[in-house]
């Protein structure tokens, strides 16, 4: 299939963008890529050959709306870039008064919070830059850099009747080791990405589409096009079918909204039978009948759902992760399966690491009106918030913390992001990059080792419920 239409100059300009402004927003700062745990160079013939030899099935699940610091901020494991290891960080109650009161990250979060943080594009702008409509040119040249100081203030703008301390508990709080035991198992046993960012600084559907297509097709909100299969760009589903790669979208949405494969006009016209109930996944995993690509939609987004999207419980989401892992681990496909657990976006929760700039996927822009009435146009030239992401298989290194990757188009040090999945799947299944964003995304093929581990747990630790916000 053809790649999505793009600006021809984007690939050529990517080097200068990353050279002039650092990965995390401060001019001149450079970071090193993480040394390969197995000696493979990402994207090299040897690494790709090993990936193809070891991995025959991929299971990919996007959970919902949690930042790295929110989920892993209280996990005391060496190497994790989080508040419990590095010290708590603070936000002003009012970004316009830097000398005023501040509130800090803390070991105080809720299994579910009542007030969903703003995760629109202009909401993210305020949380990252302290203003709804920052100057795009100044962001690109480094005159304005993200400080991630606006989370408490934005929560108070969204919910003016709550106290500042409750606002901070909701958006700055993080979970303790005891509250996320299932996820700690994954950290201890497999590979955790320290710096993995969402595709765009915006809400759910554009981020899910961008993860699946390498572009949100110019969409920056959860508009009605996603519900009527009106996204016309190529996706991993269309691409897989064109390469005779078997796939299923296991649908756990319970009819609340369409599963992600049905964002696309092509799927609605050609592959509706590839969408099956989520229950089928567990029987297919245990029976050894999984397709080459399994894409899982969790339930979302209120009480008694398992995506972790507020006000769904984090404990329910951990149960979902455990169910997926346990089924794959106990099934015959474990020996050749790569399980990727990530999130769609950071959901308006605080994270102390600013988001990097990024190569635009195409020439499209998106304009929205902010809470204060300002108009802002986004050019899809920077990533969204940092999110937890785990690589799980019989071949991933035990307890590995992966920091930075390498931009395959430029050789520059680069943070991982949602489109790193498409880049890696392209290496595995021999399909072309769908957009320039994918072409500039680090792959993670080098994290698959040459020998199957014999010490992976048969099951993950179950979570326990803990108090909700009210």
Regions found by a protein language model. Name each.
Residues 23-470:
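N-terminal pro-sequences and low-complexity stem/linker regions of secreted or lumenal proteins
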Residues 1-27:
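Fungal secretory targeting signals
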């Amino acid at each position: 299939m053809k790649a999505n239409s793009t600006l021809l100059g984007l690939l050529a300009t990517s080097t200068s963008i990353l050279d002039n402004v650092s990965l995390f927003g401060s001019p001149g700062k450079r970071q090193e890529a993480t040394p390969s745990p197995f000696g493979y160079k990402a994207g090299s013939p040897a690494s790709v050959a090993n990936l193809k030899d070891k991995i025959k099935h991929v299971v990919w699940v996007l959970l919902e709306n949690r930042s790295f610091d929110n989920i892993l901020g209280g996990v005391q494991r060496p190497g994790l870039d989080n508040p419990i290891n590095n010290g708590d960080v603070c936000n002003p109650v009012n970004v316009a008064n830097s000398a005023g009161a501040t509130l800090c990250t803390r070991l105080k979060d809720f299994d579910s919070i009542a007030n969903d943080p703003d995760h629109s594009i202009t909401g993210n702008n305020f949380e990252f830059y302290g203003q709804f409509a920052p100057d795009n040119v100044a962001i690109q040249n480094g005159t304005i850099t993200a400080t991630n100081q606006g989370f408490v203030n934005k929560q108070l703008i969204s919910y003016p009747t709550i106290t500042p301390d409750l606002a901070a508990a909701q958006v700055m709080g993080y979970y303790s080791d005891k509250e996320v035991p299932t996820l700690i198992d994954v950290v201890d046993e497999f590979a955790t990405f320290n710096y993995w960012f969402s595709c765009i600084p915006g809400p759910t559907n554009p981020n899910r589409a961008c993860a699946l297509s390498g572009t949100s097709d110019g969409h920056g909100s959860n508009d009605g096009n996603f519900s009527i299969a009106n996204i016309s760009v190529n996706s991993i589903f269309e691409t897989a079918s064109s390469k005779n790669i078997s796939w299923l979208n296991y649908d756990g949405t319970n009819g609340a909204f369409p599963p992600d494969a049905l964002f696309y006009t092509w799927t609605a016209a050609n592959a509706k039978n590839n969408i099956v109930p989520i229950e089928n996944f567990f029987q297919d995993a245990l029976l050894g009948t999984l397709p080459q690509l399994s894409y899982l939609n969790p339930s979302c987004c209120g009480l008694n759902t398992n995506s972790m999207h507020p006000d769904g419980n984090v404990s329910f989401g951990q149960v979902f992760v455990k169910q997926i892992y346990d089924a794959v681990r106990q099934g015959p496909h474990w020996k050749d399966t790569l399980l990727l657990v990530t999130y769609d976006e950071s959901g308006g929760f605080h994270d102390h690491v600013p988001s990097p700039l990024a190569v635009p996927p195409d020439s499209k822009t998106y304009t929205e009106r902010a809470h204060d009435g300002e108009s802002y146009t986004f050019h899809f030239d920077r990533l969204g918030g940092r999110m937890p992401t785990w690589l799980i298989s019989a071949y991933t290194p035990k307890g590995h913390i992966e920091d930075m990757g390498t931009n395959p188009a430029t050789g520059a040090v680069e943070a991982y992001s949602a489109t790193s999945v498409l880049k890696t799947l392209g290496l595995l299944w021999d399909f072309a990059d769908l957009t320039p964003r994918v072409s500039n995304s680090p792959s993670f093929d080098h994290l698959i080792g040459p020998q199957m581990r014999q010490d992976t747990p048969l099951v993950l630790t179950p979570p326990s419920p803990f108090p909700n916000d009210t």
